[in-house]
Amino acid sequence: LVVVGGDGTVNEVVNGLKGARVPVGIIPSGSVNVLSLELGLPHTVEKACAVIAAGRTRDIDVGIVNGRRFTLMVGVGFDALTVKNLNPASKRRYNEAAFVWTALRKEVRQGGPDFVMKAGDRRFLANFAVAANTRYYGGRFGVARKAQPDDGRLDVVAFRDRSLVGLVSFWFGALVGWGGLHVSATEARAQQVEFGLYGGCGPVWYQVDGELAGTLPARVSLEPAALTLYVP
């Protein structure tokens, strides 16, 4: 099976497969191609086809949130609200730059409700969190710096700082690969993650692989080595 598109298209295919072990090839053509970046896939049609023809495969983990499968991450809080409000034309033209600009503007102006997150035996209060299967997020932002798509774990980064300085420094850190090291960020690893409302606040939105998916509560789990992809 060959997919031509971005992360949203890949997500639809993964959900359509519903666990069927069919090797999947990806020819990147979307506005953001985080999975392709993570796997080192070429971004030209000819080279991407050559990777598929070579036949080398890699099994990666697949996450599940409230019944929906994903390959990249679940983002909760202001990033999901940003996805909800992001102008499609801006997304196509500016990619991750449009995302960060919209996120900063939205969070600084309006803020967002806190929520509770449980990862393993640890609990956090946050206004933004990512349960990640991969390092990269929204493009080349290294939010979950230790994540690997085949390690059987979700890497969680929780953040709680609404100040402009805090937000800018967090996203700058993510751009150079150490977003989880921010003073206001907390990292954890787990096979299951739960997100819930805090103090009657809500609704709190979440996004899956860059697409708006719903509101909390949400339960995230992982299927190890559940998807086979063609890789270089």
Model-derived regions: residue spans:
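ATP/nucleoside-binding phosphotransfer catalytic cores, i.e., glycine-rich phosphate-binding loops
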Residues: 121, 148, 158-232
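Catalytic core of DAGKc-family lipid kinases
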Residues: 18-23, 27-131
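Short glycine-/acidic-enriched loop or helix-start segments at secondary-structure transitions
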Residues: 12-15, 35-37, 140-141, 168
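N-terminal small/polar loop signature for handling phosphorylated ligands or for N-terminal nucleophile
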Residues: 1-21
